[in-house]
Amino acid sequence: MPRAGVAASAFKLRNIWHIHNLHRVRSQQTRLMSDSVEEFSSVFQHAKKVVVLTGAGISAESGIPTFRGEGGLWRDFDATELATPGAFAANPSLVWEFYHYRRTIVAGASPNAGHYAVAALQRRCRRLGKDFILLTQNIDGLHAKAGSTDVVELHGSLWETRCCHCKAVEANRNMPICPALDGKGAPDTVHEANIPSMQLPRCNKCNGLLRPRVIWFGECLERDVLRRTDDALQGCDLLLVVGTSAVVYLFWRNMMEVELHTDFVESLLQDDRLRSRIGLALREKSQYLLVAFRRFKFQGPSSVKLPTALGIGEDELAEMKET
């Protein structure tokens, strides 16, 4: 990957559209943002390569819990405690119960209008000859269920496993994934998770212990995912960010090597340490800021705001649900 890779691509974006309710945009930035559907439609018409990045917010309206913060715990844990290699090594039974519960929730969930709007946008882009790439931080598979294709799943998938021994990756939608997990994983049940290792999901090839094929805290993205993300952002001139505030995640690792040619949405940074480093970089290139950068912010539920902003009506959404 080129040294500036993902970072350079991201900073050359001319437009960022950000639907969110996760943070407050500072007053001076708010003045620079537009909620005009007409203006956004004009920008979309001129875009040649459209990239959509989605996060937990788009699936929350389908009833998918985030397991973060107060009220979002599974038993006495949040995801940062269970979604780690160390937690799996220490108690694979507990981690598999957690993921069995997540698979159960997702298996009973349906895509919402936000997912269908993204699928409709992909179809529209292809019809108009525009490049379209969908990147998602979600592991639920609801975009594919809504009709989106070639989805880049940044954090992996609940519906795939990887062998801890031979590293084989396989799709697995069995519910339960193994007999020992049947009836396990209830969020309000506090008991010792002690399913014997040999009764947990095992590899069909070598009988090694399986783990969910998801990216856990402390792990790097897979090499192929990084390559596809870099390819997606190369030449992208319209980035739509839906249901997440973590767009910086796409290019942070190379950020300090990049010559900034456009403004950066500082409010997307949640980490004070990162914010201070980016702030310094922005000030050093202040002559470039806010010159050719148009931003849009449509705040509210993505299932409502996304179809409206994209001009996707009820008939088109209904058609997507039927296909």
Curated annotation (Swiss-Prot):
Every Deacetylase sirtuin-type domain range: 34-323
Subcellular location field: Mitochondrion
Cofactor(s) named in the record: Zn(2+)
SUPFAM superfamilies xrefs: DHS-like NAD/FAD-binding domain (SSF52467)
Keywords from the named record: Metal-binding, Mitochondrion, NAD, Transferase, Transit peptide, Zinc
Reaction equations catalysed: N(6)-malonyl-L-lysyl-[protein] + NAD(+) + H2O = 2''-O-malonyl-ADP-D-ribose + nicotinamide + L-lysyl-[protein]; N(6)-succinyl-L-lysyl-[protein] + NAD(+) + H2O = 2''-O-succinyl-ADP-D-ribose + nicotinamide + L-lysyl-[protein]; N(6)-glutaryl-L-lysyl-[protein] + NAD(+) + H2O = 2''-O-glutaryl-ADP-D-ribose + nicotinamide + L-lysyl-[protein]
Pfam families named in the record: SIR2
Main location class: mitochondrion
Binding site for substrate: Y99, R102
Binding, NAD(+): 55-74, 137-140, 243-245, 302
Role description: NAD-dependent lysine demalonylase, desuccinylase and deglutarylase that specifically removes malonyl, succinyl and glutaryl groups on target proteins. Has weak NAD-dependent protein deacetylase activity; however this activity may not be physiologically relevant in vivo.
Name assigned to this protein: NAD-dependent protein deacylase
Gene behind this protein: SRT1505
